[in-house]
């Protein structure tokens, strides 16, 4: 029997839903041209199998970009990071039959100033998802 893996679209939608609900800011998968900041932008950077003895699992690595309003100060981007980490301290919600096994904050990967003068941070998360159980007969 073949198991269906979680669609990357479904995972990103679950991340966006949680971030938007708890930060009250938009979380895009593609930022429209000239979109006003502050905002979040989420993208999957890696999908890796992580099967155990009893479960079929994949680890989805997601980079969430925190883009603050233009300012010489970093306070705006720090607030975005703090709000994101607070929002994702709650587990994302996945549809049946998928089960979120683990949601890991891998921390801030980089903070930089874009050409536009906006502060831009990248926060990395891993989502371990079970999509079936291994049964030995």
List the predicted regions and their residue ranges.
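Charged, amphipathic alpha-helical segments and their flanking helix caps
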Residues: 1-30, 46-137
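Short acidic/glycine-enriched loop/turn segments that link adjacent beta-strands
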Residues: 34-37, 117
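A short, hydrophobic beta-strand-centered structural micro-motif
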Residues: 37-46
């Amino acid at each position: 029997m073949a198991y269906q893996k979680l669609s990357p679209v479904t995972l990103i939608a679950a991340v966006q839903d949680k971030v938007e609900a708890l930060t009250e800011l938009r979380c895009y998968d593609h930022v429209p041209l000239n979109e006003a900041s502050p905002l979040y932008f989420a993208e999957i950077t890696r999908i890796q199998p992580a099967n155990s003895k009893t479960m079929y699992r994949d680890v989805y690595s997601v980079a969430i970009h925190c883009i603050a309003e233009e300012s010489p100060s970093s306070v705006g981007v720090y607030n975005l990071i703090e709000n994101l980490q607070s929002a994702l301290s709650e587990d994302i919600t996945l549809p049946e039959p998928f089960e979120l096994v683990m949601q890991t904050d891998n921390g801030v990967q980089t903070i930089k100033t874009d050409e536009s003068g906006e502060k831009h941070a990248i926060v990395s998360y891993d989502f371990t998802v079970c999509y079936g159980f291994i049964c030995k007969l």
